Amino acid sequence: MSAPQQQHNIQQQNIQQNIQQQQPQQNVQQPQQVIGQPQQQPVYKPVIQINKTLPQQQPQQQIPQQQQIYKQAPQQIYNQISPPIQQNINSPTIVNNTPPTPVVTTPTTTTTTTQSNYSTNRPNININPASPISSTTIASPVTPTVLTSTPPTTITTPTTTTTTSTPTTTSTTVITSGTGQPSLGSIESSIESVLRKNNLVNTTNFSPVQNIGTTTPPPSSTVVGITSPTLTQTTSSPITATSITPTITSIPTTTTTNTTSPMSIGTPSSTTPVVSSVLPTTPTTTSVTAPITTTPPSSSVTTTTTTIPTTTTGSNNSVQITGTNPMVYDSRQMANNSSNITSNPTSTINTPTTTTTTTTATSNSTGTILSKQKKEKEKEKERREREIREKENKDQQDKDKGLNSGGGGGGGIGNNNNPNNSNNPNNSNNPNNPNNIEPEVLGKRKLIELLQQISPNEKMDEDAEDILSVLADDFVESTVAFACTLAKHRNSTTLEVKDLQCHLEKNWNIRVPGFGNVEQYKTFKKPHFPENHKLRVAAMKKSIALTQASSRKQQIREFKEQQKELKEQQQQEELKQQLQQSKKQKLQLQQQQLQQQQQQLQQQQQQQQQQQQQQLQQQQQSPSSKF
């Protein structure tokens, strides 16, 4: 056989071995070629298979470099714990014969499978002792225990996350293989026994997976961990206690992740959880605040209870912190938790506890009772107020009747300072009173007096009087009402002048000095004038009187002169009128004379004409007679 054929066959064998390592579950049997038979099977058939599987070799080149980093840390930690476990197998120890009952949930599983050639015979369990959240951290010794193997079980590890609204619980599902490897349940029982020996477990409310926090390695490594949120606790007022009760909210939302990785070639796949357990030690002062679920409508009640330091024997009788998380466990969960607890050696613990609990009443019955009590109180208050109002209305009616009978429209102003008006400023407008008479604050007389003070020569119409009276009533009502509110604000039952002053100055810019404040009062003394000043004042008054008299005389003279002038003017006008009348009469007489003369002339002319005609007639008759 030639050399290139031998090299080719060797490469094929190496590739087949790599394929078998990558796929251990599939029993792939490929034909092996004999070196001495070059002409048996076709050479290119396995090459096709090689080309199909070649892309799967790429992650192998990157993973082995990082596998070595993650191989050492979990194994070293596990080797530190495993020797005392193997040495003390025959030693008498307390064994948890009752395995923890699993809490069955319906998680939404999201499986992520990664394959690698890395094979281990031990689970990568990272048990790191840690102390809870406290001001001081003290390491607790770990006692050797016996690990009992149990069949594969589904275990939920609730990790509480504290939020401002409704907290949620996330659980992780861990499945261990039954190939002789220690399961998670046995590890939990061992952790539980260690915690009990150190008196760190509350026997009534204990969950074996309460304090287990999970960590995840980088995504490039083959060791795939279980992803879940870590336990977060917020510190508040310190609570001195020797045990930490588990807190699980009532509305959990579970998210589970199942991861598988091959442990060895040819063996079924199993999970390799990387679990870091938190082993609480004996804390000196721990501050724990658990989430409190509230549902509206609720009435918050804050109670502070201080207990005398008690002495308890045995870890089963350890002090329980009450009120940290109400309505967490139901009866079934309490029964399941109680079944996982075993007896531990007794010890004496002195625990002075001071717990402050803040509870919320969420039941509907208590809410209805409180609402009924509030309604009854409101009804009683309304009843008392009605009685007070009726009494005040009666008193005010009597006073109003007395004022109206006494007369005087302005009398109603003084009535506004009555302390009864401070509680009910508008009692006069109450329609429930049948005999209610609205007093007029300002009558017509008062309005006329005010108008005369402003302008004495003017008068008012009836419409103006009505409008002014309405405006005055509104103004007085508004001022009294606002002043009453100020008096109520001062928690007083009497109306004072300063209330009215405050309202008038702020809203109307009206200042009323001389009331309320002592600073506004001023001392007034009569002035002492000397005699010279008095004489001067008298002389001044005389001179003023003389000047006034002389001015009056001058005015009288001027008036007389004016009257004389007026008389003269009238006389002149009368004379003129008389002259005109005389002239008219003369003209009329002349005209009459002319007319008479004309008439006489006409008569004479007529007579002459008649005479001439007679003469002519006579002359004519005369010759006829001659003939």
Curated annotation (Swiss-Prot):
GO terms for biological process: chromatin organization; RNA polymerase II preinitiation complex assembly; transcription initiation at RNA polymerase II promoter. Residues 368-400, 547-622 form a coiled coil. Residues 404-414 have a biased composition (Gly residues). Residues 1-39, 91-184, 246-439 are annotated as: Disordered. InterPro entries: Histone-fold, TAF12, TFIID_TAF12_dom. It is found in: Nucleus. It holds the Pfam family TFIID_20kDa. Residues 122-139, 314-325 have a biased composition (Polar residues). It comes from the Eukaryota. One of its GO terms (cellular component) is SAGA complex. The keyword Repeat does not apply. Residues 91-121, 140-177, 246-313, 335-366, 415-437 have a biased composition (Low complexity). Its main location: nucleus. PANTHER family: TRANSCRIPTION INITIATION FACTOR TFIID SUBUNIT 12 (PTHR12264:SF21). Part of the multimeric TFIID complex that plays a central role in mediating promoter responses to various activators and repressors. Belongs to the TAF12 family. This is Transcription initiation factor TFIID subunit 12. It comes from Dictyostelium discoideum (Social amoeba). The lineage of its organism: Eukaryota, Amoebozoa, Evosea, Eumycetozoa, Dictyostelia.
